[in-house]
């Protein structure tokens, strides 16, 4: 059904190209996963270009759980342990311990503070001592095989920000409705139009990557 509802935004390849262009302009995008999986839409930003205003929008319209998608090499460099040794969650989402910038923040909760934490963690010269643990930002370690190995928002975010020419770190948060329920495709499409954000699916991105190989 998602593909039918999204047809007004172009075909799968066109949707990916539009999303890449939007990211390159510093905009956020929305990525939908499979209806038989989480059936959710995530706001997605490049960690390099995200602004305080975009973080505020993310917190306001999202679940509040702002996640930073990182690679395994970045996780090791920052010495971030996985949140649990044995992951029994449905989709094996790779949560590490939560983080906070050790400098430049107050309580760590505000949009400005959370963005400061993300910028600190994704800096090229970031060290473990630059971050306190726990905190209010949730790092997610991506599957090393990328989106072709795990069709999750974590891998999709890293894939598309990389395609846009940025470092492989994306910021994501699930969209929710005013009543606190999870936004589904019709609500997500309405939101994307109201905020003029490009929208695509993980399936679109997988097809795009496969076609490039």
From Swiss-Prot:
CC cofactor: Mg(2+); Mn(2+)
GO MF entries: 3,4-dihydroxy-2-butanone-4-phosphate synthase activity; magnesium ion binding; manganese ion binding
Subunit structure: Homodimer.
UniProt binding sites for Mg(2+) 2: 38, 153
HAMAP family recorded: RibB
Family the entry assigns: Belongs to the DHBP synthase family.
Name recorded for this polypeptide: 3,4-dihydroxy-2-butanone 4-phosphate synthase
Organism in which the protein naturally occurs: Buchnera aphidicola subsp. Schizaphis graminum (strain Sg)
Pathway membership, UniProt: Cofactor biosynthesis; riboflavin biosynthesis; 2-hydroxy-3-oxobutyl phosphate from D-ribulose 5-phosphate: step 1/1
